[in-house]
């Protein structure tokens, strides 16, 4: 069994912001694999289905980004999902828009949502799909990540969201190393 988590913040004011690309990609995966996120439990919205012949849970934590680990840990404890089978999808300001990077493990890199997940797991060994949202230009970091994308970036991101969905399936089917080889050079 796998858990695919998209990080984001709940609430209308955060919809389609840079910080919520994880939620947006979960929506793409949900639609592609016909998995409804219609259950509210574990401090999140979730649904279950099948991807690549594996049982999968999709999760959007509703704890706000910086406490995402609480929701994820509740799901992994309840379903006995090993952290190596938890795929976390989130925004990365160090990558330009149109890029994504897959990692098997690693530090939080300044991302408070990831920092909280590492704290709850007691480990940084879990696969992640980092989606580029670009560096802030003449504005502070908070305004940047809570800001929305312009029209051109949204068009690029629709391709990235599809690729991230394919990458999650590839991780499930063939493993993180294979997905890294296939997708880490991706540019939309």
Curated annotation (Swiss-Prot):
Q: What does this protein do?
A: Hydrolyzes ribosome-free peptidyl-tRNAs (with 1 or more amino acids incorporated), which drop off the ribosome during protein synthesis, or as a result of ribosome stalling. Catalyzes the release of premature peptidyl moieties from peptidyl-tRNA molecules trapped in stalled 50S ribosomal subunits, and thus maintains levels of free tRNAs and 50S ribosomes.
E.C. code: 3.1.1.29
The reaction(s) catalysed by this protein are: an N-acyl-L-alpha-aminoacyl-tRNA + H2O = an N-acyl-L-amino acid + a tRNA + H(+)
Record-linked CDD domains: PTH
| EC supergroup of this enzyme | hydrolase
Where is the site labelled Stabilizes the basic form of H active site to accept a proton? 91
Q: How does it assemble?
A: Monomer.
Which keywords has UniProt assigned to this entry?
Answer: Cytoplasm, Hydrolase, RNA-binding, tRNA-binding
* Superkingdom as given in the UniProt entry: Bacteria
Return the InterPro entries for the record.
Pept_tRNA_hydro, Pept_tRNA_hydro_CS, Pept_tRNA_hydro_sf
- What name goes with this protein? Peptidyl-tRNA hydrolase
* GO MF assignments: peptidyl-tRNA hydrolase activity; tRNA binding
Q: Where does tRNA bind?
A: 14, 64, 66, 112
Q: Which GO terms describe its biological process?
A: protein quality control for misfolded or incompletely synthesized proteins; rescue of stalled ribosome
Pfam families from the UniProt entry: Pept_tRNA_hydro
User: By which gene is this protein encoded?
Assistant: pth
Q: Which residues participate directly in catalysis?
A: 19
Q: Where in the cell is it found?
A: Cytoplasm
Upper lineage ranks? Bacteria, Bacillati, Bacillota, Clostridia, Eubacteriales
Q: Which residues does the UniProt site feature Discriminates between blocked and unblocked aminoacyl-tRNA point to?
A: 9
